């Protein structure tokens, strides 16, 4: 870093934290740091910030700058008088209330002056500062005063836990020093907070009584592993500029508890069991004072404390550093409490704050910490907290099966998902990790960036952020890396006609298309054969026969074109329909998007196919169809609200996961049909699909991979795990693992039912077991793409044969449960994302077979947790095969932005091959001439 960095100059010139400094000079310093090329780029040094009480200057940012370009000419005596008045005013302000204001600013925010003052002090004092900051960093607070208050709160809860937590922080910080980690990160406490949580929670979950001193040995060793895990995760997450949060703590604690367990002789842990019966809840017994007490208790549970006084003390510590962090902590705790009530959680669990602590952390992280605080990100923080609450319930129920607590896994996974969200909305601004400090300073940084970008824009600061500058320009450039599928199933029919010469059609047909036809039945002016090339001495009879033959052939060609053009309006992706609706009512456009979303489950971008699929769903079960349509509508609306790519929305790419969520939640509901309350969780879970899809796309864009139905799998798995069979409001179907050998008599097999399993397996993609529904789906696929229809049937057949090869019970085969994953895998590889050749056709069959066996494996594994496999086997197997690399030119993986449907994909591939060969021949000829 340069020696003339303004931050260093400030720290050198102001070694005493009690030296007053005007806020205006601090703001100028902040603005100079913003434009300085020597801004520290380390993603771990996240604390170059302003004091908290500089927030009131936020309102003067625009007004003070707008007048900066006005030149005022004044006389020398007037200038001297103005300077004297300013000096006297500043002096009076320094003698008055301003000194108190300045003194308070040294205790709030991240107390950077204190850190600078300690640089030349004994190492013991510096280390104490690091430990205190590490204790507060659990709640995203970089303030030693807050850390000291938090230690007081922990002592109120349990002194033994405090000792273990302190030891964990010290051991973790020392390990980071020994490993020569970034010194600024250590000084900010970023290598201490995970150790604090490890020490606390190991003491909390210990079955031994307090002051079991032998426990400090595993606390020391496990805490020392945190900097190693943190550094490793930072290396990976740096690709997406993401923080590691409390993942090192989660990994270390989970490994320790799984390694010891309840029956360990030296270090026994608390016994955790899954729910085995429906809870007995009487709503009249709910106690409002205890519910209100849950708010501070939920905040305290971040540190594993259930004492409301401890939670209150921690809230005070947060308020000292950042009132916005304190506010979002309380809001997050309330959201977790309300989410618990919506799924009939036992009151004791709610009163203990076990539903709230993950929401507290998520709400803080999204509400101003890693996103600049706007009303959009405030709402996003509420949604993230709600999503985190349900994910916490799902993980608690799932991990209880193996006797392990959920820790803060729910917070980490949900918040990372929301941080990976990409949006064209300028109000959703994710800060670079190196600029993250605390919400108030983050917002000032955001306003400064936006104002500077508005000044650089051609419009000169019209008050609306240009999408082509600054952060927003960076976001758009990153979206170009992620193939922006203007339509994943998109191809120009004119380009198909141009490329039709690849199949050997004559150039005369291309000339015919260039000439306008005033009437569709007009005889083409260009004949099939060029008569000028014939000899003048040809007999009249031969000329007449030739002319008649050419007229018949040209008429057949024209008729074939008319039929082909008519079919093109209802086959393929029906691009003409989408373009024709652009100037129509938004209602018709939205209906088109929803119908395309219904068919995109099967990789079909065709509204007519979508209508047939909806018809097939009503044939199966009208209630399921209603739930599925609602899921599609809500998922599409959410994508619009989040300003996702409009062309992807129009292609139905933000709707198909929603339809599967709605359908499968109705299928697995134990309440039966027309349980209207089920539509509430259908709406909530469907709305998470665009968020999950955007986050996964950000990750998968590194390898140019689609997200497939992973958002649906995540959403439905979380919902089913969070509710379960014993939930009072939303009970689900009971799934249990096999405990006995199935009784199979091969002579009892029925060939007719096996054949019927082919359409049933296709219908099971939507959760339907009606063969007529599966047949309607096949017709819908055939209308859009015969190749998709063919590979769907092949995939279902392969799944059935694979099930027979491992002696699967016949009922499972007849119901198509072994065929739907193979169906999707065969379509994806057989011409959809690979160009269709005989090699990729065989590859599709192999992928379908692999998906069938993987489906059986996951079904057996997930049944232990009471969960269905959904389409996890398809996603994992298809992604595995798409990551395949080969030197065989016939195995050609299409760029994601060029994927349409198999027939058009092959035309694109052949045209590329033709261009490549032509360029190769040209290069060879040029080389030969030279």
UniProtKB/Swiss-Prot annotation:
GO cellular component assignments: apical plasma membrane; basolateral plasma membrane; membrane
Membrane topology of this protein: Multi-pass membrane protein
InterPro entries cross-referenced by the UniProt entry: Ammonium/urea_transptr, Urea_transporter
Species per Swiss-Prot/TrEMBL record: Mus musculus (Mouse)
Taxonomic classification: Eukaryota, Metazoa, Chordata, Craniata, Vertebrata
Compositionally biased region (Low complexity): 12-25, 32-43
Keywords: Cell membrane, Glycoprotein, Membrane, Phosphoprotein, Transmembrane, Transmembrane helix
Chain ranges passing through the membrane: 145-165, 185-205, 213-233, 242-262, 280-300, 311-331, 350-372, 401-421, 610-630, 648-668, 676-696, 705-725, 774-794, 813-833, 842-862, 864-884
Glycosylation-annotated residues: 743
Name this protein carries in UniProt: Urea transporter 2
């Amino acid at each position: 870093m340069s020696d003339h960095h303004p931050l260093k100059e400030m720290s050198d010139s102001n070694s005493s934290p009690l030296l007053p400094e005007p806020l205006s000079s601090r703001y100028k310093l902040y603005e100079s740091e913003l434009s300085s090329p020597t801004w520290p780029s380390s993603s771990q040094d996240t604390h170059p910030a302003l004091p908290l009480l500089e927030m009131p200057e936020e309102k003067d940012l625009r007004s003070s700058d707008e007048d900066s370009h006005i030149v005022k000419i004044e006389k020398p005596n007037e200038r001297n008088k103005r300077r004297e008045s300013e000096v006297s005013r500043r002096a009076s302000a320094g003698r008055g209330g301003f000194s108190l204001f300045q003194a308070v600013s040294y205790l709030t925010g991240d107390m950077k002056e204190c850190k600078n003052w300690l640089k030349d002090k004994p190492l013991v004092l510096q280390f104490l500062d690091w430990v205190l900051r590490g204790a507060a960093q659990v709640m995203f607070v970089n303030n030693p005063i807050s850390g000291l208050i938090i230690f007081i709160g922990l002592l109120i809860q349990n002194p033994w836990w405090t000792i273990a937590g302190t030891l964990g922080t010290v051991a973790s910080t020392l390990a980071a020093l020994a490993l020569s980690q970034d010194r600024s990160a250590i000084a900010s406490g970023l290598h201490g907070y995970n150790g604090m949580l490890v020490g606390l929670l190991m003491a909390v979950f210990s079955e031994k009584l307090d002051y079991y001193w032998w426990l400090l040995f595993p606390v020391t060793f496990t805490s020392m592993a945190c900097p190693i895990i943190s550094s490793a995760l930072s290396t990976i997450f740096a690709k997406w500029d993401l923080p590691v949060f409390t993942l090192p703590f989660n990994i270390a604690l989970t490994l320790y508890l799984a390694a010891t367990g309840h029956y360990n002789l030296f270090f026994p842990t608390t016994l955790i069991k899954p729910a085995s019966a429906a809870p007995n809840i009487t709503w009249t017994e709910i106690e409002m004072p205890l519910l209100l007490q849950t708010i501070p208790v939920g905040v305290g549970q971040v540190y594993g404390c259930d004492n409301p006084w401890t939670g209150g003390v921690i809230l005070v510590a947060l308020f000292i550093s950042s009132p916005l962090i304190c506010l979002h902590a309380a809001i997050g705790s309330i959201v977790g409490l309300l989410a618990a009530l919506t799924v009939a959680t036992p009151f004791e669990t709610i009163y203990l704050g076990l539903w709230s602590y993950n929401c507290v952390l998520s709400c803080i992280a999204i509400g101003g910490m890693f996103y600049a605080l706007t009303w959009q990100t405030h709402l996003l923080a509420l949604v993230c907290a709600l999503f985190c609450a349900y994910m916490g319930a799902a993980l608690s129920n799932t991990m209880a099966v193996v006797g392990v607590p959920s820790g803060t896994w729910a917070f980490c996974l949900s918040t990372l998902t929301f941080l990976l969200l990409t949006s064209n909305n300028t109000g959703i601004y994710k800060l670079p990790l190196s600029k993250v400090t605390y919400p108030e300073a983050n917002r000032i940084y955001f306003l400064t960036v936006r104002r500077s970008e508005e000044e650089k824009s051609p419009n000169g600061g019209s008050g609306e952020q240009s999408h082509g500058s600054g952060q927003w320009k960076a976001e758009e450039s990153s979206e170009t890396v992620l193939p922006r599928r203007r339509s994943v199933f998109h191809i120009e029919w004119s380009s198909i006609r141009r490329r039709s010469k690849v199949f050997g059609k004559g150039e005369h047909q291309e000339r015919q298309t260039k000439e306008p036809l005033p009437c569709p039945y007009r005889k083409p002016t260009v004949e099939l054969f060029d008569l000028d090339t014939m000899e003048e001495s040809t007999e009249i009879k031969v000329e007449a026969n030739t002319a008649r033959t050419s007229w018949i052939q040209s008429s057949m060609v024209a008729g074939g074109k008319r039929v082909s053009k008519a079919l093109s309006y209802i086959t393929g992706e029906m691009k003409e329909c989408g373009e024709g609706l652009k100037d129509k009512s938004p209602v018709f456009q939205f209906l088109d998007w929803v119908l395309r979303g219904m068919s995109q489950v099967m990789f079909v971008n065709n509204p007519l196919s979508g209508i047939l699929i909806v018809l097939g769903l009503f044939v199966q079960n009208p209630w399921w169809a209603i739930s599925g349509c609602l899921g599609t509508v809500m998922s599409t609306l959410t994508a619009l609200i989040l300003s996702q790519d409009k062309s992807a929305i129009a292609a139905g790419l933000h709707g198909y996961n929603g339809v599967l969520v709605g359908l499968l939640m109705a299928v697995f509901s134990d309440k039966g049909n027309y349980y209207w309350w089920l539509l509430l969780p259908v709406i909530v879970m469907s709305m998470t699909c665009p968020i999950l899809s955007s986050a996964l796309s950000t990750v998968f864009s590194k390898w140019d991979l689609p997200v497939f139905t992973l958002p649906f799998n995540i959403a439905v798995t979380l919902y089913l795990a969070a509710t379960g069979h014993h939930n009072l409001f939303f009970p689900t179907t009971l799934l249990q693992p096999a405990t006995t050998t199935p009784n199979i008599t091969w002579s009892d097999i029925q060939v007719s039912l096996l054949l019927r399993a082919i359409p049933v397996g296709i219908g099971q993609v939507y959760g339907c077991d009606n063969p007529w529904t599966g047949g309607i789906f096949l017709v819908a696929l055939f209308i859009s793409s015969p190749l998709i229809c063919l590979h769907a049937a092949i995939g279902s057949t392969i799944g059935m044969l694979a099930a027979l090869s491992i002696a699967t019970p016949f009922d499972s085969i007849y119901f198509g449960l072994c065929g739907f994953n193979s169906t999707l895998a065969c379509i994806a590889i057989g011409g959809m994302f690979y160009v269709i050749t005989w090699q990729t056709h065989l590859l599709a069959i192999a992928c379908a077979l692999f998906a069938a066996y993987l489906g059986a494996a996951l079904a057996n594994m997930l049944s232990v947790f009471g969960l269905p496999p959904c389409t996890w086997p398809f996603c994992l197997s298809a992604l595995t095969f798409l990551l395949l690399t080969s030197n065989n030119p016939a195995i050609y993986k299409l760029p994601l932005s060029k994927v349409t449907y198999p027939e058009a994909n092959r035309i694109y591939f052949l045209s590329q091959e033709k261009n490549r060969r032509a360029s190769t021949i040209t290069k060879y000829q040029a080389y030969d001439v030279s």
